[in-house]
């Protein structure tokens, strides 16, 4: 039906988009800490945000502009979340946006996104002083992805070209950041998606919601939902091409790649784990069980220790509130079945095989509840000493 090819460029891959990262002095040692994404052509933007009741100022500012609106520029800063800053947080954004528009009159409804420490005013003067370094049209997507990092171990970007059977094509690119305070109730930490596909304005939000459901909504690092979670989609229609099935597939691929990168990059994490739950009474029940596994500290520390302690998995499912029965439950590490509908298969040989699975950097734990047909896969990681160190020293 259509072909999907990985390409370079991240958010700059689609036609008409540019991005860069600059150093505004927010991070130490002159590191990149402010980024922008810009569309040369008129663009529409739609976004989904955190369900945290204390949503940060950039989110409250954005929400005042509507569900889908004209916008060709986003400014992103690290080190400061601009959260719990009240009316002054909004005023600081308005102050910066006015100066941006004065410097670059072609900008339409520029918006802002922030990540970092909660409870401190935005260092707007430092950011304003760095605006002179912005060069619209610069295609430095990798630098932009680096600039938005906080405790991330690596930058996260991806891009695809989609070719339709008639030879027409469009591109989609994205970047994300996130490693800690990840348990999105709708998005991720920060994710910015660009496309030159001619996405209908009235379809943008629904397609975003569909793709988020099985990607960013399916990950957890530490069970905490940020005040700043944002996933933002820009469409500038530059290709003039759109086919909904192909676009949704590409959007899901982009989000899946970035979501699993975020889970893999859990602060100090060494392992990415897919928690596959099947046989639940409904998809909602499967989601509840899978997410309980991603956030269980006992499960996460067992993964860190490469200990196939299946009892912790059973206990977590049993306390998750879903319908379950120990005489129907099956638990596997990879393809190694350790518990089968009331029968304990966990002898020394099975334990070593299961431990061998857990020594891999990426593996799955499968739980068949044996109740119905509901299924869902959530992604998580281990939790070890480094997580405590990173977060204990976060503000130093």
Curated annotation (Swiss-Prot):
Coiled-coil region list: none
Pfam families listed in its UniProt record: ArgJ
Record bears the keyword Transferase: yes
Hydrolase keyword on record: no
Compartments in which it is found: Cytoplasm
Site (Cleavage): 187-188
Keywords: Acyltransferase, Amino-acid biosynthesis, Arginine biosynthesis, Autocatalytic cleavage, Cytoplasm, Multifunctional enzyme, Transferase
Biological processes, Gene Ontology terms: L-arginine biosynthetic process; ornithine biosynthetic process
SUPFAM superfamilies from the UniProt entry: DmpA/ArgJ-like (SSF56266)
Domain of life: Bacteria
Ligand binding (substrate): 150, 177, 188, 267, 391, 396
EC number annotated for this UniProt entry: 2.3.1.35, 2.3.1.1
Enzyme class: transferase
GO cellular component: cytoplasm
Reactions the enzyme catalyzes: N(2)-acetyl-L-ornithine + L-glutamate = N-acetyl-L-glutamate + L-ornithine; L-glutamate + acetyl-CoA = N-acetyl-L-glutamate + CoA + H(+)
Active site: 188
InterPro entries according to UniProt: Arg_biosynth_ArgJ, ArgJ-like_dom_sf, ArgJ_beta_C
Site (Involved in the stabilization of negative charge on the oxyanion by the formation of the oxyanion hole): 115-116
UniProt-recorded Gene Ontology molecular function terms: glutamate N-acetyltransferase activity; L-glutamate N-acetyltransferase activity
Biochemical pathway: Amino-acid biosynthesis; L-arginine biosynthesis; L-ornithine and N-acetyl-L-glutamate from L-glutamate and N(2)-acetyl-L-ornithine (cyclic): step 1/1; Amino-acid biosynthesis; L-arginine biosynthesis; N(2)-acetyl-L-ornithine from L-glutamate: step 1/4
Cited function: Catalyzes two activities which are involved in the cyclic version of arginine biosynthesis: the synthesis of N-acetylglutamate from glutamate and acetyl-CoA as the acetyl donor, and of ornithine by transacetylation between N(2)-acetylornithine and glutamate.
Subunit-level organization: Heterotetramer of two alpha and two beta chains.
Family of the protein in this entry: Belongs to the ArgJ family.
Protein name: Arginine biosynthesis bifunctional protein ArgJ
Organism this protein belongs to: Wolinella succinogenes (strain ATCC 29543 / DSM 1740 / CCUG 13145 / JCM 31913 / LMG 7466 / NCTC 11488 / FDC 602W)
């Amino acid at each position: 039906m259509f072909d999907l090819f990985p390409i370079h460029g991240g958010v700059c891959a689609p036609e008409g988009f540019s991005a860069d990262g600059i150093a505004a002095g927010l991070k130490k040692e002159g590191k990149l800490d402010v980024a922008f994404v810009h569309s040369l052509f008129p663009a529409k933007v739609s976004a989904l945000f955190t369900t945290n009741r204390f949503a940060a100022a950039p989110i409250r500012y954005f929400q005042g502009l509507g569900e889908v609106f004209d916008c060709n520029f986003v400014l992103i800063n690290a080190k400061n979340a601009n959260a719990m800053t009240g009316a002054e947080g909004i005023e600081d954004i308005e102050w910066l946006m006015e100066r941006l528009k004065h410097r670059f009159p072609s900008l339409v409804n520029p918006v802002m996104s922030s990540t970092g420490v909660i409870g401190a005013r935005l260092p707007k003067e430092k950011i304003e002083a760095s605006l002179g370094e912005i060069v619209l049209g610069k295609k430095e997507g990798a630098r932009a992805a680096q600039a938005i990092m906080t405790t991330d171990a690596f930058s996260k970007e991806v891009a695809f070209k989609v070719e339709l059977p008639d030879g027409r094509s469009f591109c989609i690119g994205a970047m994300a950041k996130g490693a800690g305070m990840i348990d999105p109730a709708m998005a991720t930490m920060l994710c910015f998606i660009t496309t030159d596909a001619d996405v209908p304005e009235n379809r943008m939000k629904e397609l975003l919601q569909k793709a988020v459901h099985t990607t960013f909504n399916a990950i957890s690092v530490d069970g905490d939902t940020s005040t700043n979670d944002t996933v933002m989609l820009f469409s500038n229609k530059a290709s003039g091409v759109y086919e909904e099935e192909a676009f949704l597939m590409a959007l899901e691929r982009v989000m899946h790649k970035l979501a699993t990168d975020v889970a893999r990059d859990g602060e100090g994490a060494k392992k990415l784990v897919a928690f596959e739950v099947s046989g639940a009474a409904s998809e909602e029940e499967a989601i509840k069980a899978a997410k309980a596994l991603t956030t269980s500290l006992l499960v996460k520390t067992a993964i860190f220790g490469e200990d196939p302690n299946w009892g912790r998995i059973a206990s977590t499912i049993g306390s998750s509130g879903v319908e379950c029965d120990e005489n129907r439950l099956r638990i596997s590490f990879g393809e190694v079945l350790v518990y089968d509908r009331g029968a304990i298969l966990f002898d020394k040989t099975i334990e070593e095989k299961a431990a061998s699975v857990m020594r891999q950097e990426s593996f799955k734990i499968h739980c068949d509840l044996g109740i119905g047909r509901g299924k869902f896969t959530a992604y998580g990681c281990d939790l070890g000493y480094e997580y405590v160190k990173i977060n204990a020293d976060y503000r130093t």
